[in-house]
Amino acid sequence: MEQGVNSNEWHGNAKIFRTYLKGGGKDGKRSVEKHKGLGNIRTFGDAAQFPSFGAVLSDGWVDISFDDAEMSKTFLAIAKDQQWHCMVLENKNNGHIHTYWKDTEHKIQKFRRDQRLACGLLADIHGGDTYIPLRCLGSDRFPPVFDISPDEEYQEVPDELLPVQTNYNLWQMDAGGRNNDLYGYILVLQSQLQLDDDRIRTMYKAVINPYILKDPLEDAELDII
């Protein structure tokens, strides 16, 4: 995995983005060009001449973004540990990140804000013709802070990042009934994502326990759950 590419060496991503657009508005976060249903409108170099510009995702790609600095840091730690093959762009003003994934199987059906992910993080999920800001009023959100190497391929959205409908809030969960909640959450993953016991066990041990819970459980206690 590559990290920290020089901004002068990054010229967009032809796999992830199908076109680039001029941005504008009070905060520079909105497209000022029509693009819904249209193909290639501008190249990266053409759009980069403007104080604000952005991009539109290619078909079969999703943007999973975290509007919380702590969750963004946690995601990056997980991504590095799990060696996920994705691209991550960061808003340097607040530490929030956008992560980009293949979803050719269309496992994610709804694009909306504040979706609970299987691993316990909370995210906004974008797709389709959504405009994604890359520069806002002169402030760049590139180059990537995390990306694949030239000889690697981007991966499909991992199970950990698929949205689920649940009232369980695993983020920073501490002692006090959490074992019961973690047991009940297994049923959510089984019924909604059709994950088997081994896949759920791996998710708990590799991601949820060390990164999501406030204080990780001992292995013996986790095995009981």
Segments from the language model and where they lie:
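Signature for HUH/AEP ssDNA processing cores
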Residues: 1-95, 102-106, 168, 172-174, ...
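DNA replication initiation modules
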Residues: 55-72, 76, 101-202, 216
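Conserved short hydrophobic interaction patches
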Residues: 81-82, 189, 207-210
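Amphipathic alpha-helical interaction segments
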Residues: 83-84, 108-109, 212, 219
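Basic, alpha-helical nucleic-acid-binding regions used in initiation and control of genome expression
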Residues: 201-225
